[in-house]
A protein has these predicted regions:
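Non-catalytic terminal accessory segments
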Residues: 1-148
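Arginine residue identity/basic-tract feature
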Residues: 2, 37, 41, 67, ...
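Short, charge-rich amphipathic segments
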Residues: 17-30, 116-131, 154-163, 189-203, ...
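Acidic, His/Gly-rich catalytic cores of divalent-metal-dependent hydrolytic chemistry
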Residues: 18-23, 31, 52-66, 149, ...
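C-terminal segment of N-terminal export signals and the immediately downstream linker at the start
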Residues: 101-104, 135-172, 182-186, 190-193
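A short, flexible N-terminal coil/short beta segment enriched in small residues
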Residues: 119, 125-128, 136-155, 256-275
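Soluble catalytic domains of enzymes that build or remodel membrane lipids, polysaccharides, and related
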Residues: 162-411
């Protein structure tokens, strides 16, 4: 149940921000034509009303996909407004400071408000705020079209002691399907077709098959059961797979949901690794594959994984690949306690589904929370690869950080 006092305060704050921004926009558009001013006014207040209405009515929206989009548009607009308001506020503080200095020095405050040449800086800052905020909002809307824009990321990885028969062995790594968020079967099928086209020897999935409930997979079994490989498909659980974010009627109901999800993995033909290890064999040689339940160094995420149990009986002289959903596990436990684990595969972060990335540079706000958040990381002897996620959660889109299918070739 939502707190009415909190909702009331939130609405009042947002309405105050709405009018504050509108006053600045009116000032900026004084020299524009009537048509432009009317169009901006209609667009601005339409978005404000949608946002405020979504906050009031969100519990009554029953369609999960409509909820996704209305939530994303509303949150995007609120973030956009905060960016604008922050820049406008900085400018107002600057202007107020100059005015106060002018008063104290008995000078005209106006002389402090303009640059000697060109645009008055207050106008520049105001347009800067509008430009930054508009770019952000437009990029979020554009990102709706990227949620199924799957890409293959190819990595060649060397493992010490790898038997020669595994040279050129191809592994597909996927993570974070979040089936409860998926909507378009044809689009998802294209992602599955991309996986199949790589002809992998082995497929590895590192958790978060669902958002909360095993039933989310009911309409997707025919799609994901197509994911197969000669040496099998192996999977593990992520934080969302346990149903921890749902209020269950009983503990038994929650446990039944987990049991049902484990059966979903089995019905897909995927071998779910629950704090255990298996041998991946070829022509009499093998390496070890270890999979654990979710283990996070972050306090708000669960530590169900038991790596000590999972490593039982392993020959440390052979390569070990670990499946562990949360990349924070790598520095917190794997590096200090298990130097024999040469490669860990993770997901979880999604790259926040928002950022900038090119061959020379990558950035996302998620890096302020996760040191290892996308791609390859390594120490002298150990490696971590963080998959950017196949699906999406919350925001039904991706900006800059596209959904990923990782193709690993052992060399």
């Amino acid at each position: 149940m939502r707190n009415p006092v909190f909702i009331s305060i939130l609405l009042m704050v947002l309405i105050a921000i709405d009018f504050y921004i509108y006053q600045v926009l009116k000032h900026l558009l004084q020299g524009s034509g009537a048509g432009i001013r009317t169009a901006v006014r209609l667009l601005y207040w339409t978005l404000c009303i949608i946002c405020l209405g979504a906050i009031l009515l969100f519990p009554y929206f029953t369609n999960p996909y409509f909820r996704q989009y209305i939530f994303s548009i509303s949150m995007g607009w609120m973030i956009t407004q905060l960016v604008m308001a922050l820049v406008f506020l900085i400018d107002d503080i600057r202007r107020g400071t100059f005015w106060a200095v002018g008063k104290i020095s008995n000078a005209s405050g106006a002389q402090f408000l303009n640059t000697e040449n060109g645009i008055p800086r207050s106008t520049f800052l105001s347009w800067l705020g509008v430009g930054l905020a508009s770019s952000l909002f437009i990029s979020l809307i554009y990102g709706f079209g990227n949620k199924y824009n799957y890409r293959i990321v190819k990595k060649s990885i060397s493992l010490k002691g790898l038997p020669a028969v595994f040279k050129g062995f191809k592994i597909i790594h996927i993570s974070d399907i979040h089936s409860g968020s998926l909507q378009d079967k044809m689009a998802v099928q294209k992602g599955i077709d991309l996986i199949k086209a790589q002809n992998p020897d082995l497929v590895l999935f590192t958790g978060d098959l669902v958002n909360d409930r095993a039933t989310e997979m009911q309409n997707w079994m025919d799609v994901f059961s197509q994911v197969k490989a000669p040496h099998g498909v192996f999977s593990t659980l992520g934080n969302h797979d346990y149903g921890d974010y749902v209020k269950w009627d009983t503990k038994e109901a929650k446990q039944q949901n987990l049991n049902d999800l484990m059966q979903v993995h089995a019905n897909l033909g995927w071998r779910l690794l629950m704090n255990e290890n298996v041998k991946i064999e070829k022509e009499g040689a093998h390496f070890h594959l270890v999979g654990i339940e979710n283990w996070s160094a972050k306090a708000r995420f669960p530590k169900y994984g038991k790596l000590e149990d999972a490593m039982s009986g392993i020959n440390a002289n052979l390569p070990i690949i670990l499946l562990s959903h949360d990349p924070s596990h790598w520095e917190a436990e794997v590096i200090p306690k298990y130097p024999e684990v040469q490669l860990m595969l993770s997901g979880h972060t999604h790259g926040m589904q928002f950022g900038l990335e090119n061959p020379y540079f990558k950035w996302s706000p998620v890096q302020w929370v996760y040191k290892q958040w996308a791609g390859m990381y390594q120490t002298e002897k150990q490696q971590l690869y963080v998959n950017r996620g196949f699906g999406f959660l919350g925001y039904p889109g991706r900006v800059g950080i596209l959904p990923e299918i990782t193709l690993i070739e052992l060399v």
